[in-house]
Structure formats: C-alpha cells, structure tokens
Amino acid sequence: MTAAALRRTPLHQLQKEAGARFVDFHGWDLPVQFSSIIKEHQAVRNACGLFDVSHMGQVWVTGKDALPFVQKVNSNDAARLKPGQAMYSHMLNERGGIVDDVIVSCFGPERWFIVVNASTREGDVAWLRRNAAGFDCLVDDQSDAMGMVALQGPAAKEVIGAVSPGAPALGRFGALELQLWGESCIVTRTGYTGEDGF
C-alpha cells in the first residue's frame, strides 16, 4: 500500500513533527519508534510511555438490550460488571471460536464500550451488527470519530493524575468518563504492556 493510501490517526502530524519513523500496520501509517526502540522500551519499564492506539476499533453498544447482547457475544460474564468496570474478554462465534479479543467497559446496563483490534475492526463491527438482530440495542462504531492513547509504565498514575485527578483512583480494569480540555473522554486502567497504565 502506498504511503498516501494509508490511514492516519489524529496524532499523525504531531508524530511526524516529533521525528517518528512510520510503518504500515494493517493499512495504518503508525509510528514504530521516535528515538530508539531500546530507550522507548526502558521508558515504559522504568517511567512511562505514550502509545497512539487510535487505529483500534471503538464501539458503543447502547439500548434496553445492551447488557443481554454484550453477554451473548462475549466469553466472560458481562453481567458481573458494575458501571465503571471493564474486563478483558473474547467475542465468540456460534461454534465457540474466537472472533477477537476485546476490552469491554460498562457505563450502565444500557451503555457499553468495546475496544476491538485494528486488523479485524471492520469485520468485528459487521459481526456485532449481525448478531444484534433481535436485540433492542444500537451498535455504534465510533472508531473514525475518536482517538485513543495508552499511557503505560510505573509512572503512568502520576502522569495522568496531573491532567485528570480522578483517574489515578481507578482500580485495575476501572473505567471512567470525564471531560479533559473540553472533550468527552473515556479512561480505563488497562493495557497490554505488562505495566500499570491507562
């Protein structure tokens, strides 16, 4: 795919100005490094690093049957989540095979937020919409309207606390809706680095 045909996140220009080296990741022009991979790895292990993960899918499921629907399509028990909690789960097909691994956040019995992987986003959203037939709920793909970053590392709690005083109080797999700089944001205490993060 040519560089002109690659999709770009809302942070692309800032990353370019910061000297990022970009790679094609499933049709997205994403930064693979800024200074050195080793320095950036050490930053995440010893302090913190910020990852642009806007390429991942961001899907709201809302409506009267949102909980029964989310319960149907996930391997873990969504009914055990209270508002403000999230879980790692798998979406399963009718044979029990894995469609994708996801993070599911509960913001009330009628409001759920699901983060799906970039490489399977379009298929995941289509699959969710097909499976929503018969449920009184809306599957709303907000992926192109939202950016997403991951702040990861032992100092992540301190750094996020400087801009969002409520976020550090979240427990592991906690979820919070808030306003930052006049914008609606979702903060979850999750990540894939093995370090603490948001």
Label for each model-derived stretch:
Residues M1-F198:
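Basic, glycine/lysine-rich polyanion-binding surfaces/domains
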